[in-house]
């Protein structure tokens, strides 16, 4: 059983696992996500109910881990990159196999081929990973490499949502408009293919918006898009202290 661990659920996961392990002593529990990836060994030392941790991006690691448990391919956990686990053959000493190389975002499988189970739910979608900023309090600042899903692939997948009249598609890109060409192409596409129903939600940095983008937005149907604007602080001293950059005049 695997748990994705984020800032909003990590305390509950830690509290739940000791009792869950008592109920299911034969089950090996795994954790993954940003709250456990960067101190995986220490996390396992402090949380004995967990057997292992998947570190970093999980798509390929989870696939191989499932292969290990289902058909023992690979034959040992040590053959899987991106995991830390208790080695049963070494007095349960913790083994860390190291981080995987960051994957090509265009190779991540499309998760919504069948929308039946997602009917009337928010669809979460990702067209980029990484963040251009280095806010000192945020784990996103650790990943310095910005990666983008192929724009034509994104358009094709968004058309699937549009054709199915999904109520809302929420982009989880950390700063959607950090690359102008990428953002502009997607905004232009959803504007041209508006079905009158689907709403698209984006997290953006307002001071990065260009006149071309604002002009495109001015032609959109009211409610076609929602913009969640990240303003970490309006105090210049605070912005400097957290190593963030922001054009306050443009933001105003």
Task: Label each PLM-derived region with a short phrase.
Residues 1-99:
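Glycine-rich beta-alpha loop elements in corrinoid/cobalamin-binding modules
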């Amino acid at each position: 059983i695997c748990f994705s661990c984020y800032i909003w659920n990590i305390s509950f996961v830690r509290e739940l696992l000791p009792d869950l392990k008592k109920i299911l002593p034969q089950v090996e529990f795994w954790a993954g996500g940003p709250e456990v990836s960067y101190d995986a060994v220490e996390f396992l030392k402090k949380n004995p109910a967990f057997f292992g941790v998947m570190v970093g991006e999980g798509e390929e690691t989870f696939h191989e881990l499932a292969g290990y448990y289902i058909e023992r391919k690979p034959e040992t956990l040590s053959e899987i990159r991106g995991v830390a686990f208790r080695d049963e053959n070494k007095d349960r000493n913790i083994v860390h196999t190291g981080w995987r190389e960051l994957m090509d975002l265009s190779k991540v499988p499309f998760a919504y081929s069948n929308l039946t189970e997602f009917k009337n739910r928010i669809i979460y979608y990702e067209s980029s990973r990484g963040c251009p900023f280095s806010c000192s309090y945020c784990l996103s600042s650790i990943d310095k490499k910005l990666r983008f899903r192929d724009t034509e692939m994104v358009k094709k997948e968004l058309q699937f949502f549009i054709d199915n009249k999904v109520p809302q598609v929420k982009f989880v890109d950390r700063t959607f408009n950090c690359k102008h060409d990428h953002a502009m192409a997607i905004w232009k596409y959803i504007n041209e293919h508006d079905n009158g129903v689907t709403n698209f939600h984006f997290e953006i940095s307002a001071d990065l918006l260009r006149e071309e983008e604002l002009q495109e937005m001015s032609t959109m149907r009211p409610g076609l898009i929602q913009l969640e604007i990240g303003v970490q602080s309006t105090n210049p001293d605070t912005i400097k202290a957290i190593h963030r950059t922001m054009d306050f005049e443009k933001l105003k």
